[in-house]
């Protein structure tokens, strides 16, 4: 069995890497890939433990990074959704020669809420962790519903996510658990000033997992970065508003 991550590479142009979020896999980007293929050489990966990389595992951001480094292009634009945004930010901080520009999508340097920071309530994360041990299939489906909640097209969004995720092998429970621990524990806020490359932060106005207040807080922490808010989207703007999403990426890449 291969010890390499599953990468799908297609298209022509500057290198652009797409990282999915927790419980998902690279198939979630299909709508985006079809639109961006004429403009970029796209590198879509199944992170360790997910999709066609389900037989692999990584317990930390750096372990994920080490597996990505084996086949990742250098000087690429990195686009990370949700947990994938944490991975992309980690790459930008610790392996900057691979990241020419950084794009985070519905992501946060710290996902768990605390007194003066908006985010996912710790009890929600611990409930997901408990459910995982009972039935990880149902847990992932619940997470999909949570990601789409609030979007006017929530039902269709969930359908699209399910179609994508279930088209590939199921994630392994060990990696799902490790991912939840990262969402609960990782805090990159103090490291953000060390980011040197151009950065674009994309948010869904209706997102229940990464509240829009996070965008305002990060505007102060990252004054040189750009941000855009998708008005009709919840946690998956590239599913809800794919045309607008691709327009933002093309515009940012061209700068």
UniProtKB/Swiss-Prot annotation:
Keyword list, A-Z: Biotin biosynthesis, Cytoplasm, Hydrolase, Serine esterase
Chief location bin: cytoplasm
Subcellular location: Cytoplasm
EC number: 3.1.1.85
Any one Gene Ontology cellular component term annotated for this protein: membrane
Catalysed reactions, as listed in the record: 6-carboxyhexanoyl-[ACP] methyl ester + H2O = 6-carboxyhexanoyl-[ACP] + methanol + H(+)
The keyword Hydrolase is assigned to this record: yes
Domain AB hydrolase-1 span(s) in chain numbering: 16-242
Pathway: Cofactor biosynthesis; biotin biosynthesis
Entry-linked Pfam families: Abhydrolase_1
Keyword Ribosomal protein belongs to the record: no
UniProt-listed GO biological process terms: biotin biosynthetic process
GO MF annotations in UniProt: pimelyl-[acyl-carrier protein] methyl ester esterase activity
Binding of substrate, residues: 22, 82-83, 143-147, 235
Active site (record annotation): 82 (nucleophile), 207, 235
Top EC class of this enzyme: hydrolase
Transmembrane segments annotated in the record for this chain: none
Family annotation (HAMAP family): Carboxylester
Stated role: The physiological role of BioH is to remove the methyl group introduced by BioC when the pimeloyl moiety is complete. It allows to synthesize pimeloyl-ACP via the fatty acid synthetic pathway through the hydrolysis of the ester bonds of pimeloyl-ACP esters.
Family under the similarity heading: Belongs to the AB hydrolase superfamily. Carboxylesterase BioH family.
Subunit (UniProt): Monomer.
PANTHER family, alphabetized: AB HYDROLASE SUPERFAMILY PROTEIN YCLE, MONOACYLGLYCEROL LIPASE
Protein name per Swiss-Prot or TrEMBL: Pimeloyl-[acyl-carrier protein] methyl ester esterase
